């Protein structure tokens, strides 16, 4: 252990070491620092007996890992003294020795273990500017995080600094005259929908109430109002941003219009830190929700009808097709936007659902009229308030699925055990007004798609990871040949694909223009992650 500690203190980066907890007590010493681990302590704490040159940085559970942070060592050109002094320049900062470090270093998806040297909890735009300036000055890697709900660790970093915007989660202003609402970038979908619904305000948000508003908007925003009002990003009229040079400015159709174009569909982690969004809204008092249940054995019959009907029906109706496993019913559910009255809406909904009702295969059927908040809670019942482990893949589909593809879906979903009830194939209907927007009107390119398919594997403990991921990888491998256009949703990043191939699948023909805009606003590639848009100098 002492040899490892000595090597750790000499390392260029912040290391981890593991402690043999079979012994009751360990005394670790190096230079003039002595650390004691006492297994008899119920909190499994490390006690720093003497600490003049080295700071012990310990996550809450020492069994997993801990850091040695040397005050005599530089990391990415910045001394630990400078890192520690950052706390005097920002409102709130979390270091690895801070009590809640483990909570804040993780995202919603607990598959990913990253260890930043600091997490700045941004309570103001000044906090963001200060952090960006610090990272530029000291060449420290940086990531910006909104709701922490990303499928991949694009907002996480090892040995860098994370700007966590979740303290900034307020509705700043509702402008009744212009029918706009300004919302801070750290807001989560559930609370915001609840607040807006009380004022009869509807914005075409997504369906997962635990999602962050920023990531949802910057990548697209697929939800149950899509076929009438488009993506969430289609309702954005202004964004306040902090650029890589620390300038605070706006992006809209009058100011930095090229950046405004890029941020709508490719904005996550590529060009700037977006601090606030201004959305156009519509007024709505209620929506009508339907749910139909079918036997798993009838999946093919129902899906063949639904997939040809759902993208082309009345634009006020958006629906999705959900398959879980052979032990659970297949669910078709959706939302009809309000008309003249709730009663007339329910009658219209029954009329629109005729192609599915005529199959006479449903084992359950309900229609309910409810508020926007109630609808968000209804659709969000499948969302998880607690973090968990998950792995996703997705595809945009441009033609009805052939029988062979449907058979593959049914086969792989049938392999799941009864206790794998949260694994899911979700097919969202697109089309309508979403498809009337040109593919180059924003950075989001896949406007002619008629479905978005999302395949999800979830598990509760890390020992289930290999089995869960293997199932989905085999499933996805078999299904891939039926999506020759290879278009993916950037809000469902796929790190199994090489970066250049991934960029082409996310942005299509818009990629070259995005690289030009990247070169204009962030030529040094300060904002980056594994599959970020490169500047010209970095493009390979």
Model-derived features: positions:
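Soluble FAD-dependent oxygen oxidases
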Residues: 2-540
